[in-house]
Amino acid sequence: MDDQNKNLILATGLSFLVIMVWFFLFPPPEAVTEGEPTVATQQTAVAPSATPDAPTTAVPPDADLPETQRVVIDTPRLQGSISMLGGRLDDLSLKSYHETLDPQSQIVRLLSPVGQPNAYYALYGWTPAGALGYEDVPGANTTWTQVGSGALGVDQPVTLQWDNGKGLVFTRTISVDDHYMFSVAQTVENNSGQAVQLAPYGIVARHGKPLNLQNFFVLHEGVVGRADGKLTETKYDKVAELPQVAREGAQAEVIDAQQDGWIGFTDKYWMTTLIPQQGQPFTSVTKYVPGADIYQAETREQLVTVAPGATAEVSSRLFAGAKEWETIRAYQNEGATEPTEGAEPIPGFIDSIDWGWFFFLTKPIFTVLHWLNHMIGNMGLAIIALTFLLKALVLPLAYKSYVSMARMKELQPELEALRERAGDDKMLMQREMMRLYKEKQVNPAAGCLPILIQIPIFFSLYKVIFVTIELRHAPFFGWLKDLSAPDPSSIFNFFGLAPWAAPTPGTTMALIFIGALPILLGVSMWLQQKLNPAPGDKAQAMIFAWMPWVFMFMLGHFASGLVLYWIVNNLITFTQQYVIMRSHGHHPDIFGNIKASFSRKPAAQPAGKAANDGAAPAKKRKP
């Protein structure tokens, strides 16, 4: 078999091997309900490091907590309530997102109160210092009172108040924008007659791991944070393995930031993040309490001294919602989704989206995909347009590769002559081949490049489709209602024409009876092979024959958006290669190669025909 076919088999085999490794090391996660993420109980905050602190103690999961009044939250994107017990933000749902494709299904619930499975909420408060004790400051079980009445909404803040009975009056004003950002202004009025010291804190806590934890290797779920430009990601298992810190009374990691940062919990599509005032030093803490199985993220700001008769105020923010790219980017660059006076940008906030190892590819790929979707209005068409752009971007390199492939075809008669002269002397054959390649300026490995280039692009697009919420429940046409999910159709029921249901996703039957899109993928790969005749070697010919159908089943249960990309990529590659080969005097006999693939005993081909890749026999030179 000629070297070009060997290179093609090598490149295809390498692609297959990479996908096999990916498939087995990173198997698709089990289907889960995307409704209610897990939630955590809170614990009392730890005093700032400037003073000796008592260890924090979490509220046990089965603790009996008194019924309290609540303040309703109602915005265009959010609904829920704030508990007067601790002033906890512990009841929050996302109006724009449903658990399933059914518009009548429940909306996604993000936060849940203590007493419900996997409690998950945010809490703010003060840590005492100096002469103050924990009974003098508001904490997890403080009962607050609403000043005035009404629900929390856009441009409708609510104010909570608590008097400690010893001259200190604490006030908390909470506001929310039209997306997912809460602003929390905490004030303390000192009427005690003596100066007091205390430090503000924020807590996001979860009871146990999320019920819908996907535990997928390429997906980060757990604590995510940034401190002075450094991003940290800690999965739940790693949080539970943190070293015991006596001062914290728990397993913990403490990071002191000098200028900016944030910390919280991230799921695949949702996030709850504490954002202290930027430009000021603060401490971020990741903590795990084994006895109560509580995961906790904290921010602690600097110690505040309040003179008698004075009032101190500290402001911070809380993001609780969907990781929408445009929204996150607006908070990062402008501090708000709309021009807002005094809004502080949040450095590095876009990295709360899990861009993965290939972030240098996933970020620009998604940026272009998002823009195309905005322009076209259909994510499937945007993926097709993105494929054309990517192919145009690598066309110069692909062109050189295809030209090299065409030149290799021209060398086949000379290579055959070399083989006859060299006989069984492999060293002589290798030396003469290298001399011929150098003389003709041909790179035999260049044919691998078009396939190898696709590998990082394929995995980057896979990452984008898997983690970005913009692809979640994004429809294409017809039966493809969710491009982030596998093709739901099945050959088992003739793609919905038969009166019986398709196999349940994830079952062996579903693995065998794939959908229409994977079949189109196999056909497109098979058609691409027909630009060249089958290899003469029977074993290599069999590998070529089976490769498209193996890929068809391998990729059949990947996201349909990714399979769509691969199909379009194959068709563009087929067209490019065909045009370039014809421009260099080679006319692929596609129909002849297809016919030969169905023949049990392919007819013997003239030497010139074999050498010219299914084209008309070359004219013999006159002696």
Swiss-Prot record:
Residues 601-617 have a biased composition (Low complexity). Its main location: membrane. GO terms for cellular component: plasma membrane. InterPro entries: Membr_insert_YidC, Membr_insert_YidC_N, YidC/ALB3/OXA1/COX18, YidC/Oxa/ALB_C, YidC_ALB_C, YidC_periplasmic_sf. Gene3D superfamilies: 2.70.98.90. Keywords: Cell inner membrane, Cell membrane, Chaperone, Membrane, Protein transport, Transmembrane, Transmembrane helix, Transport. It is a multi-pass membrane protein. One of its GO terms (molecular function) is membrane insertase activity. The keyword DNA damage does not apply. The chain crosses the membrane at residues 8-28, 379-399, 449-469, 507-527, 543-563. Pfam families: 60KD_IMP, YidC_periplas. It is found in: Cell inner membrane. GO terms for biological process: protein insertion into membrane; protein transport. Residues 601-623 are annotated as: Disordered. Belongs to the OXA1/ALB3/YidC family. Type 1 subfamily. Interacts with the Sec translocase complex via SecD. Specifically interacts with transmembrane segments of nascent integral membrane proteins during membrane integration. Required for the insertion and/or proper folding and/or complex formation of integral membrane proteins into the membrane. Involved in integration of membrane proteins that insert both dependently and independently of the Sec translocase complex, as well as at least some lipoproteins. Aids folding of multispanning membrane proteins. This is Membrane protein insertase YidC.
